[in-house]
Amino acid sequence: MDNQRLILFIVFSFSLLLLWEAWQDKQAPAPATRPVAGAPAGSAAPTPSTALNAPAAAPAQTGFAKGARAVVETDVLRATIDANGGDLRELQLLGYRETEDKNRVFTLFEDSRTRPYLAQSGFVGGGLPTHRSTFELTPGTYRLTGGAARLEVPLVWNDAARGVRVEKTFIFTRGSHEVAVRTRVVNRGKEPLDLTPYYQFTRHGEAPRGESFFLYTYTGPAFYTDAKKFQKVPFTDIQDGSAEFEKTATNGWVGLVQHHFVAAWLPEESVKREYYARSLGEGLYSAGVILAEGQLAPGQQKTFTVPLYAGPQSQAVLEKAAPGLDLARDYGWLTPLAYPIFWSLEKIERLVGNWGWAIIILTILIKLALYPLSAAGYKSMAKMKKLTPRLQQLKETYGDDRAKLHQAMAEMYKTEKINPLGGCLPILIQIPVFIALYWVLLAAVEMRGAPWLGWITDLTAPDPWYILPIIMGVTSILQVKLNPQPMDPMQAKIMMIMPVAFTVMFVFFPAGLVLYWVVNNILSIAQQWAINKQVEGSGKPAPAKT
């Protein structure tokens, strides 16, 4: 197998791996209705109470009771807060559009019958409100207007008989996708209160609407601690009880990750906590964290705040929000290589003002940086192509005597000073760059809705007119033509089929990735053509010895 076939085979295998991951995700077993506990009994950290596992008394059409509602509008968010539970029931990100309908604002949290996704909080144990308690809330629309930097929406829960008051306040900040949830507990009673608040997400187990079958991206809970770092916990693992993650810590966060977006509760460091994930039945799951805030003596009060980030996976923003939150933007096993690639891409975009042109410029720069390596590979292929007639002659001479054929070929390579594998390593070194760039382009929410040229209005969506995939297919065929043809007719057919298969697959790939591939193909064709001419003009090789 020559170098070109090797690189095509590896990239084709990588593409098949992506398709396999997508198929596995689509074929995952439907969630059962049996709940699975997510936290071990007897743990030193606070444990979810059995009350939290009880089914909610709620209308059948939604699964969650509805109460008075406050609609909050800032410059970047539109949120709905419900007095029933004090939940954040709906959240729209005003700067982003839905994949299926560009006229609709992107919805992250959704209070629907079939696809609920909520942010909830409450207290473990009796005597304090949970996400099923009713709060006092002044309904209406709250707008962040004028020069105000922040907006507060207060909710109150009272137990007059026991002298306990809980104030939950949602704090919104201009220009930010972070919502602070401040809780103030006042104990005017005669007994101390155990403060073990929990913060969780409740979500359906399906992938977001509009996700491509051909491009698998992770959707599900994720936990981060200093000890275990970033841990994904698939819904299927939660369902069958095999979920593994760090349960207790004094740091970290819990989140729900999906393509381009993440929601995460970010408790402050040093507070003792327990993480949990469980199945609620009927296709619903919850993942959260319980904090140990200690006891509140009679006549005392205590205030604690937990930020909720719910927004795009913007690398710069995530890095500042919390340690390890930037890992929600998953680049896979090539993260160390992907980070500098995205850094370079972002710097170029700032200069040219267009992500499409930034991809083209970065592709050229990568090609120049790898030129010495790729030139060695292309030179080896050019020499092999020059020997193709002689190799064919040897095959005709020795027929099925493969031992003598291989011996004659080895002597020819030695005479012509050609190492048939000499170009493999340089080309193999380039493959991680392509894979890392693939993950960068797939994960970059900065390109969501970003246009390039004419018909390309969103670099993260497939080419609507299939122009780039067709160009990619044509250039891939030209590349095959420029390289030595396999002596085996079956291999030759496969080499011609692979570009067609690539074209079909890349119809469903993001336009930004296909744009990179097209530019890379064109540059590779130019480089290969020039090297072929150089080798062809270097003299005619001696005839084959038989």
Curated annotation (Swiss-Prot):
Keywords for this entry?
Cell inner membrane, Cell membrane, Chaperone, Membrane, Protein transport, Transmembrane, Transmembrane helix, Transport
One Gene Ontology term, aspect cellular component: plasma membrane
Classify the main location. membrane
Extract one GO molecular function annotation from the record.
membrane insertase activity
Q: Where, by residue number, does the polypeptide cross the bilayer?
A: 6-26, 351-371, 425-445, 465-482, 494-514
**Compositional bias per record (Low complexity), positions renumbered to this chain:** 37-56
Q: Where in the cell is it found?
A: Cell inner membrane
Supply the Pfam families for this chain. Answer: 60KD_IMP (PF02096), YidC_periplas (PF14849)
Q: Which InterPro entries match?
A: Membr_insert_YidC, Membr_insert_YidC_N, YidC/ALB3/OXA1/COX18, YidC/Oxa/ALB_C, YidC_ALB_C, YidC_periplasmic_sf
- The region called Disordered is annotated at 31-56
Q: Give the quaternary structure.
A: Interacts with the Sec translocase complex via SecD. Specifically interacts with transmembrane segments of nascent integral membrane proteins during membrane integration.
UniProt xrefs under NCBIfam families: PRK01318.1-3 (NF002352), PRK01318.1-4 (NF002353), yidC_nterm (TIGR03593), yidC_oxa1_cterm (TIGR03592)
Q: What does this protein do?
A: Required for the insertion and/or proper folding and/or complex formation of integral membrane proteins into the membrane. Involved in integration of membrane proteins that insert both dependently and independently of the Sec translocase complex, as well as at least some lipoproteins. Aids folding of multispanning membrane proteins.
Q: Which family does it belong to?
A: Belongs to the OXA1/ALB3/YidC family. Type 1 subfamily.
The protein in question is named Membrane protein insertase YidC
Protein source organism: Thiobacillus denitrificans (strain ATCC 25259 / T1)
Q: Which gene encodes it?
A: yidC
